[in-house]
Amino acid sequence: MTEEELTAEFGENGWKQLPDAITRRYRFIPAKVEVDEHHVGVYVSKTDGHMIKGKYPKSLLHGSPVSASLAAAVMNGKYVNAVPLYRLEQEFLRYGLAITRQNMANWMIRLGEEYLAVLYDHLHSLLYSYHVIQADETPVLVKRDGRSAGSKSYMWVYRSGHMYPEKQIILYEYQRTRNASHPREFLKNYSGICVTDGYQVYHTLEKEREDLTIAGCWVHARRRFDEALAVVPKERQKESASYLILKQIQTIYRKEGKLKDLSSEERLSRRQVAIKPLVDALFAYLKQHESEVGTEKLKDAFSYALNQEKYLRVFLTDGDVPMDSNASERAIRGFCVGKKNWQMIDTINGAKASAIIYSIAETAKANNLKPYEYFEHLLTEIPRRMDDSDRSFLDDLLPWSKKLPGAIRKPKKQ
């Protein structure tokens, strides 16, 4: 305001300046494509006509114009925002850049294999240091995998337990089948507890090894009682066994929720006092009433819970073990959203590269990083260090490294 306006309002020298009031409006700056043009000196002899050229700057991929920023944009588009490559092709064309989906697919395969795989392998080795991990799997179609059309392949996911909020690791692995050989190989150097659903292959691994414990998922058990309750007439639901069991599981979860901010030792102690008696009572009820069960849905729910009892009780023996595998299901959700959009992967190499890139993307998100900026940083730094015999530089690229540029981290909510 002008001095005249202030004098009119307050009188001569009748005011003092306070801190400014601030208003904000947000502007959006659209993406744009720029060309980095490098000029290389070319020289010819005046006597015999032979030519020499200066050194070209090293490219990210030999014979390709792709840069770290462009590759990061493709990765962010497909593997974070679930945009199929044909739509990215159309989007880039609107910005004046003509690149085919086949070119982009080839870039993803080569970048995954040549650069990002080294960080993936490093994260894999670090996952072994966690006392509790989680595992899950989801089907995926691969068009050219040497089998008949419609044959299911699988994307397996392994992640650090969600009781460890810092230094999260989420790793995908593509395999053609769902048999036990795949987690057996992936977890061959792991000792600890793995939280899973009730899929038998995990129990097979536990029987083979003394250093691996499988913990069960209470959400999968609860889901079967939900399904059993759904077939009971509404007016009789509150009198049904399904309802009583679900109320007991709800009580267990409510008490568990109150322990989330405790240390592992305190959580275990409180579980023994407040939750174990409820679990004991629940399984006693299931065993007592198993022979009285009527509907097929309820029989299935009773059978599942009783068969899984050993695994469902593991969380009562270790404060780091969660009650369910929800964290691994959340970790695989990004892949499932993308799968609905692009429906199938073209080749086995594409599936393997997708597993690597999804792993980096989901691990970045879990550690509060901005995936695009993280991809660009990795694709700038890793190529420069690939000839290093010492791989310690990978520690500086981990999502929790303090040496990462600050711009890669998501800002705290205002």
Q: Where are the regions that the model predicts?
A:
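Carboxylate/His-rich catalytic cores and anion/metal-binding grooves
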Residues: 2-63, 67, 99
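Helix N-cap / beta->alpha transition motif
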Residues: 1-2, 217
